[in-house]
Curated annotation (Swiss-Prot):
This is Stress-70 protein, mitochondrial. Residues 432-679 are annotated as: Interaction with FXN and ISCU. Residues 669-679 have a biased composition (Basic and acidic residues). It comes from Bos taurus (Bovine). The N-terminal nucleotide binding domain (NBD) is responsible for binding and hydrolyzing ATP. The C-terminal substrate-binding domain (SBD) binds to the client/substrate proteins. The two domains are allosterically coupled so that, when ATP is bound to the NBD, the SBD binds relatively weakly to clients. When ADP is bound in the NBD, a conformational change enhances the affinity of the SBD for client proteins. GO terms for biological process: calcium import into the mitochondrion; chaperone cofactor-dependent protein refolding; erythrocyte differentiation; iron-sulfur cluster assembly; negative regulation of erythrocyte differentiation; negative regulation of hematopoietic stem cell differentiation; negative regulation of hemopoiesis; positive regulation of apoptotic process. The lineage of its organism: Eukaryota, Metazoa, Chordata, Craniata, Vertebrata.
Length: 679
């Protein structure tokens, strides 16, 4: 155990068993930066070095993802290969090991529910034992398993994948979308996260970017990004609230906009509340009604449940614009009496009754955010709605009742976050110069102290980047090391908060208790990610810190996942090359056979037979296309094309000579006729 550096020890922290630290406040407050200093650091942080190439803004969403780039002073949302501006955050693995991302993955979910991953953002940076993960296990058809580091991972066909990997596959799709538009490699990115994400979740998101091959310049909060999208072209000063209810998370942020400075005053939220919960609530209602009417329980039938899940999502969306919808699922299941069909009418009022508790859960965080920002609802000049769930009329009414004003629909709820990320990318690249973003840390940071109490060092809603230091000392004679448990959260007891890591300070020179002065510095960067360092004030030497992470991906894990992602990218490239070669070959076969039929009278029979043999060989090659390379198929197709061109060239020459022959004989007959007429 270590004690405070002051003569009178104010309190002991940690337990004797853990040899924990003891801390004391300095007379002038924490040995760190003042609030004004935070602002200076924040401003300086945006004076980035020159960044080469475009910076893409990516909204890595729970349900859908979106990518945008800056074009001049405007952000442009990009369409994917399917022509859509948003991409489902769905990844699937087929029986033959093929990986599908986006809409192709979503389309086959009904027939492959156990190996189709959706809403995995809810697992990112979480431990397997987290209550939210245990709840999710009961609701999804795919397997969520405990990884060797205790984190929650997913399993498909016996292979384990971290949620960061699944996120990386989606990011690779977004990267590809950007590259197709830009015409060159996209390397730099700004990725958004829910404002209420903790350090582990932010780090795991950054890892996902690294695995996908992106250089993540900044991780920014989704509501803040939406505020940038809203306020970029606004000149008036005002306080705004951003109410962000997306597919998996809920955030509320209060911001003050003044002459291009976007300062977050407070943020709050719930990282396990969103559209997925609305879908799940409606699914449970449908399954319950179906059992009441037919006596059949669908809960053990994953394929039927996936159909109901998709129908529930569709009904939810329809009820935002209609007061009633029909849910029709023919041949949903069957029992001894035959097939069972689902036919149900659902009104908007019924749906609102089913999800009313979920909507109510957004109220307390909003009230807390206003309280932390020290503003009343009359001070808020605009309420911005972000996230697909804010299209629901009941949600809009709740927001209006809460803030006392009709919410603004000035931004597209699906695209605003990606647009804001692209604007932030423009700021970092130096293309956008009149914008400054001052964000905050959403959760308090501190250490475990005596009796398991959580002692805060950096309070929530502190402007970031920020740095605060505290001096510790030993609590026993001759003590050479001490363990510090760093936590993040708002609960009074450390055990109820998120354990970020256990930091063991070693190599402390043996001395009487209270003599060594070890300055431990807690630093939160502009991404909201926590760093910890320690220094012996007596010698000026940096002390060695052994970090025992409470989970997350190691450097080796990330390197392996990068290699796997590159392997998948190479496989995708080879597959695309093979598909293009097969299409080319089939086109050549079709054209050759058509021309052979058209010119059969002009072609030598033996040459035709040779060409037919070539076509047969080509068809045999295509029959085993999955084991052939695209290059082999392309070469064989080119050979067939050359052979057919030579043959048809012969046919054309023969036809031309026949035409000339018939033309000259016809001219002779005309001359004879003319002679006869003259006579």
């Amino acid at each position: 155990m270590i004690s405070a550096s002051r003569a009178a020890v104010s309190r002991f922290v940690g337990t004797a068993a853990s040899r924990g630290p003891t801390a004391a406040r300095h007379q002038d407050g924490w040995n760190g930066l003042s609030h004004e200093a935070f602002r200076i650091v924040s401003r300086r942080d945006y004076a980035s070095e020159a960044i080469k190439g475009a910076v893409v803004g990516i909204d890595l969403g729970t349900t859908n993802s979106c990518v945008a780039v800056m074009e001049g002073k405007q952000a442009k949302v990009l369409e994917n290969a399917e022509g859509a501006r948003t991409t489902p955050s769905v990844v699937a693995f087929t029986a033959d090991g093929e990986r599908l991302v986006g809409m192709p993955a979503k389309r086959q979910a009904v027939t492959n529910p156990n190996n189709t991953f959706y809403a995995t953002k809810r697992l990112i940076g979480r431990r397997y034992d987290d209550p939210e993960v245990q709840k999710d296990i009961k609701n999804v058809p795919f397997k969520i398993v405990r990884a060797s580091n205790g984190d929650a991972w997913v399993e498909a066909h016996g292979k384990l994948y971290s949620p960061s990997q699944i996120g990386a596959f989606v990011l690779m799709k977004m990267k590809e979308t950007a590259e197709n538009y830009l015409g060159h490699t996209a390397k730099n990115a700004v990725i958004t996260v829910p404002a209420y994400f903790n350090d582990s979740q932010r780090q795991a998101t950054k890892d996902a970017g690294q695995i996908s091959g992106l250089n993540v310049l900044r991780v920014i909060n989704e509501p803040t990004a939406a505020a940038l999208a809203y306020g970029l072209d606004k000149s008036e000063d005002k306080i705004i609230a951003v109410y962000d209810l997306g597919g998996g998370t809920f955030d509320i942020s209060i911001l003050e906009i003044q002459k291009g400075v976007f300062e977050v005053k407070s943020t709050n939220g719930d990282t396990f509340l969103g559209g997925e919960d609305f879908d799940q609530a409606l699914l449970r209602h449908i399954v319950k009604e179906f059992k009441r009417e037919t006596g059949v329980d669908l809960t053990k039938d994953n394929m039927a449940l996936q159909r109901v899940r998709e129908a529930a999502e569709k009904a939810k969306c329809e009820l935002s614009s209609s007061v009633q919808t029909d849910i029709n699922l023919p041949y949903l299941t069957m029992d001894a009496s035959g097939p069972k069909h689902l036919n149900m009418k659902l009104t908007r009022a019924q749906f609102e009754g089913i999800v009313t508790d979920l909507i109510r859960r957004t109220i307390a965080p909003c009230q807390k955010a206003m309280q932390d920002a020290e503003v009343s609802k009359s001070d808020i000049g605009e309420v911005i709605l972000v996230g697909g769930m804010t299209r629901m009329p009941k949600v809009q009414q709740t927001v209006q009742d809460l803030f006392g004003r009709a919410p603004s629909k000035a931004v597209n709820p699906d695209e605003a976050v990606a647009i804001g990320a692209a604007i932030q990318g423009g700021v970092l690249a130096g293309d956008v110069t009149d914008v400054l973003l001052l964000d905050v840390t959403p959760l308090s940071l501190g250490i475990e102290t005596l009796g398991g109490v959580f002692t805060k060092l950096i309070n929530r809603n502190t402007t970031i980047p920020t740095k605060k230091s505290q001096v510790f000392s030993t609590a026993a004679d001759g003590q050479t090391q001490v363990e510090i448990k760093v936590c993040q959260g708002e609960r009074e007891m450390a055990g109820d908060n998120k354990l970020l890591g256990q930091f063991t300070l070693i190599g402390i020179p043996p001395a009487p208790r209270g003599v060594p002065q070890i300055e431990v510095t807690f630093d939160i960067d502009a991404n909201g990610i926590v760093h910890v360092s320690a220094k012996d004030k007596g010698t000026g030497r940096e002390q060695q810190i052994v970090i025992q992470s409470s989970g997350g991906l190691s450097k080796d894990d990330i390197e392996n996942m990068v290699k796997n992602a590159e392997k998948y990218a190479e496989e995708d490239r080879r597959k695309k090359e093979r598909v293009e070669a097969v299409n080319m070959a089939e086109g050549i076969i079709h054209d050759t056979e058509t021309k052979m039929e058209e010119f059969k009278d002009q072609l030598p029979a033996d040459e035709c037979n040779k060409l037919k043999e070539e076509i047969s060989k080509m068809r045999e090659l295509l029959a085993r296309k999955d084991s052939e390379t695209g290059e082999n198929i392309r070469q064989a197709a080119s050979s067939l094309q050359q052979a057919s061109l030579k043959l048809f060239e012969m046919a054309y020459k023969k036809m031309a000579s026949e035409r000339e022959g018939s033309g000259s004989s016809g001219t002779g007959e005309q001359k004879d006729n003319q002679k006869e007429e003259k006579q």
